[in-house]
C-alpha cells in the first residue's frame, strides 16, 4: 500500500486524541464474568431493523477501497456474503453500488452523503432502492472535512482509474465532476453544509428504505432522530477523523440508547478491534457494531482471503468472550457483566 493511502486509512484529525480515545475507552471497561452458566451453546445472531443478522457486526462504510486492493469493495462484499456479515457501502466507493448489489451480502445498506444538488442525492437514493439495498445510512458529521494532518503532510493522490464510481455513472447528474484526480476536496465541497432535521424528514419521504442517521453522540440528538422519523441511530465520531477531542463512541453509547428510548435501533462504530469490544457495546445497548479500519487493512494484506480471516477472528473472539462471560445469546447480554 502506498504511504499516502496508508496514512489516509490510518489517520485521524488534529492531534488524534479522539482516534486514540475510541480504543482507550473500550479498555477502561472491564468485565465481570458469570460462572457455572453452561457455556456449551451460544447464539451469536441479533436482530436489527427487524432483520436477523448471523453476527452482530457489519462492515462500516469507508471510502476508496481500491486504494487497499485492486478488487476493492468487490472483495469485501464477497467475503461478507461468505461469512454472513452485513455491509454498509460508502457513497465514495470505487465500485458502483449496482455491482455490489449483485453479490448480495446480507444485509446490504447504502451510506449517503447529502449533496447541495438534490438531484444527485435523489439519484443515489433511487439507485440504491432500485438495486435492493435494505436501508439508507445518512452521515451527518461531515458538513466540512476535519483537519487531517497526516493527509496534509502526505497529500492523498488517487489514481485516475480509481474513480468515485457512484458519482461517475454516465447517466448520473453531473457525473463528469466526480473524478477525484486531486484527492477528495472537489467531491466533499459538494456536500450540503446546511442540513437540519427537516432534511432528514425529506430523505425519509423519498424512499421506502428505513433511514438511519450516522454521527450522533448525544442523547438529545438521538431523541430528535426518532422524532424526525429515523429508524436507527449510529453512534459515531467518524473514526476520530472529524472533530478531535470528541467523546469516544463507547462512552457516548449509553446516553444515545437512553435518548431513543427503545423507539429506534442503536448501532456503534469507532474503536472496535476485539470480540470483547463487540460484547461491551452490546451490553451497553447497541444492537450491532460497525467495523472499518481492521477490514480495510485485512483487505490490503490479503485481499478477499484477508477479509475472511478478519471476520473469522472477530467472530471467534466474540464467541469466546460470550462463553467466558457465561452469556448465551448475543441479543440478550446483561449490562451487569460490565464493571462500570
Residue ranges and their predicted role:
Residues 81-103, 107-121:
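A gly/proline- and charged-residue-enriched helix-loop-helix capping module
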